[in-house]
Amino acid sequence: MSEEIIRLVNVTKEYDGVQVLDNINLYILRNEFITLLGPSGCGKTTTLRIIGGFENVTGGDILFEGKKINDVPPYKRKVNTVFQQYALFPHMNVFENIAFGLRIKKVDNKAIYAKVLQVMELMNLKGFEKRNIDSLSGGQRQRVAIARAIVNEPEVLLLDEPLAALDLKLRKEMQLELKRIQQRLGITFIFVTHDQEEALTMSDTVVVMNEGKIQQIGSPIDIYNEPKNVFVADFIGESNILDGVMLQDFLVHFHGRRFDCLDKGFSANEEVDVVIRPEDLKLVAAEEGMLTGEVQSVVFKGVHYEMMIQSSEFCWMVHSTQMEEVGNEVGLRILPNDIHIMKKVKGD
């Protein structure tokens, strides 16, 4: 079983009386790739900055290896940070940028040379030692920034949306590269992003945040397949979300009819939210469908078609490799394991 390295206990943070973190409780394991995911203003970057020591908590505690570090300054914490703006030194070449932290620590030149070359090889920067920062591409600069952080051998690396400035193709490549580096180094990565694909691609654990609160913690598969509430279901991928009534265990009513499902533990006739992913809806002939509807629009998305299908009570988003023409009447089949039931949150 993995060892816990960081724990946040009842952490709150206020700016000018406005609460931006509300009672955050979270533990992070050694050698884990964990992602804080959420929309702008959800508190994910504030959480990262608190772990790094760049922000103080209003309430609660930060524990590192079981010891309280609330008052420990950033430079004394066993963490390094890669910011969205890489903050590289333009007057230094690549080698000296990476070596900077080691020189501050007064590491001897022989050790600096060996460590920097080792990290440059890991980051696929071999041969770039004397290159000026201004001559590098965005992806190369990002590699230098990460190399500068990991050469100091931190126990935890904090990454604040480091891929945000890269183009789509390079961003996808760097997602896999970061995961490879983390596995090779065996250190804890805490990654912040608003990009769901990044979180699902790289992470061992995803922490979904909204309005200063943790909404759900789980593996990428759990977060996607078993969202805890409507926010998570809507934020992670696409979803069809309907009002329903849980009649009894394994039986739910929505869209004017009853459906078998796999959920239990709700009160009889409890109002619930019903979530069905677009890729889980099966297109069939109209006479074979559990529901029928008319195709309103069709958009080719590369690996599938996205169709909007208007039934009697709802406009369904459907993802399918099978294309239907606009105006066609089609049937939809919904299987029990494709239906996700969740408790309604007050205000829904």
Curated annotation (Swiss-Prot):
Residues annotated for ATP binding in this entry: G38, P39, S40, G41, C42, G43, K44, T45
PROSITE patterns reported in the protein's UniProt record: ABC_TRANSPORTER_1 (PS00211), ABC_TRANSPORTER_2 (PS50893), POTA (PS51305)
GO cellular component: a single term: ATP-binding cassette (ABC) transporter complex
A Pfam entry, by short name: ABC_tran
EC number: 7.6.2.11
Stored InterPro entries: AAA+_ATPase (IPR003593), ABC_SmlMolc_Importer (IPR050093), ABC_transporter-like_ATP-bd (IPR003439), ABC_transporter-like_CS (IPR017871), Mo/tungstate-bd_C_term_dom (IPR008995), P-loop_NTPase (IPR027417), PotA-like (IPR005893), PotA_ATP-bd (IPR017879)
Catalytic activity, reaction form: ATP + H2O + polyamine-[polyamine-binding protein]Side 1 = ADP + phosphate + polyamineSide 2 + [polyamine-binding protein]Side 1
Membrane topology listed for this record: Peripheral membrane protein
GO molecular function, one term: ATP hydrolysis activity
Subcellular location: Cell membrane
Keyword list, A-Z: ATP-binding, Cell membrane, Membrane, Nucleotide-binding, Translocase, Transport
Domain of life: Bacteria
Class of the enzyme per the UniProt entry, highest EC level: translocase
Job of this protein: Part of the ABC transporter complex PotABCD involved in spermidine/putrescine import. Responsible for energy coupling to the transport system.
Subunit-level organization: The complex is composed of two ATP-binding proteins (PotA), two transmembrane proteins (PotB and PotC) and a solute-binding protein (PotD).
Classification via PANTHER family: SPERMIDINE/PUTRESCINE IMPORT ATP-BINDING PROTEIN POTA (PTHR42781), SPERMIDINE_PUTRESCINE IMPORT ATP-BINDING PROTEIN POTA (PTHR42781:SF4)
UniProt-listed NCBIfam families: MMSYN1_0197 (NF043075), potA (TIGR01187)
Similarity field: Belongs to the ABC transporter superfamily. Spermidine/putrescine importer (TC 3.A.1.11.1) family.
The protein's name: Spermidine/putrescine import ATP-binding protein PotA
Organism (species): Desulfitobacterium hafniense (strain Y51)
